[in-house]
Amino acid sequence: MISPGLDVIHPLHRRADTGMRSCRQWLCAAALISLLPLLATIRAEAAVGSDSLNVPAAMNDAGVPVPVIGVAQVGGALVSVGPRGLIQRSDDGGHSWRQVPSPVSSDLVQVRFSDERNGWIVGHDSVLLHTSDGGGSWQVQLDGRRLLALLQDWYGQRAEDGDAVADDMLREISMAMNTSATPDVLAAPFLDVLFDDRGHGFVVGSFGMILHSRDAGATWEPWIERTDNDRRMHLYGLDERHGVFYATGEQGLLMRLEPQAGRFVALEVPYGGTFFGVRALDGLLLVHGLRGNLFASRDDGQQWQKVETGLDSSLVSLVERGGQLVAVSQGGQMVAVNPNTLAVTSLQPVRVGEIYAASLSSVAEDMLVVALFSGARVVAIAKAD
């Protein structure tokens, strides 16, 4: 399936002149910049008589490296995802991988686990997959067809009851679908998903897409208008602490869930660039983004301190390791951050190519597994000389 473009679920007249800029920023955040030639070929092939939402991923030749975009640890194993529905599992800390059957052939960009059994994968064509066996098998919970039907039904019922906001949302959906190459699919890419231990969670994506679930993803309700994101900025990252969720986005957007109000409210951060991720720890909130920018707050976002990482490329991951955080950049630079003092220690950079994501190895605390165009690779965490 060829995605119909990223102009979905947002006020088209407000951002028509920024479409190409937004598209480029999303591709950067989704860690797909260097994958564009490959993905163009993939989608051109897939467009001929196939539907990526209904066609399972093809099984690759064993031992042949394939691009990996996201990676996550689950128990003593690792799961990675990539283009054309790729799902892989490693039981030896990332040194070897075996492909896992995938029910779709859409591009997959992120994988998360809430415990050793339950995990979720998100990607293009509004795909959301779920596993209940630690990543051994995956089922579709949501896709672009189901999402379109959900939004039309959800806002349609409220518009009939006189809800003006719902009526506006229906018009936005209609405008997006009128130009869609796949008129029955809302192909907004999902970029992150996260659940707490109660089964409450959110999925976020391009142009302000956000959905909420109270039953581990079995059912969903749209929250697009329940955020301080009227400009429909892309939402890139999620984190949660003690039932409070945080979401990051472009142009310095950071939002915190206010449970009693039932909406995400914006927090002011002294930076206007894109934030790709957020980490919520006890007594410490961190956001990371473009050009090595990392900010920390000890009062839940009221005041901020810039952490001088000394890095000049975008931070793609913050990995907890031995009481510290390892900040990993797209260019392979790394630093360790002490969460108590915010002191920064330089680490040995890794020369492996552009990094899309990173996870701690499942077998050694002095190793990371990084997602690369050439596949997942194990690298050492070592102090700089």
Map each language-model feature to its residues.
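Residue-level hotspots at or immediately adjacent to binding/recognition sites across diverse folds
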Residues: 2, 44-385
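Bacterial N-terminal signal peptides that target proteins for export
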Residues: 4-30
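Bacterial N-terminal signal peptides
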Residues: 28-38
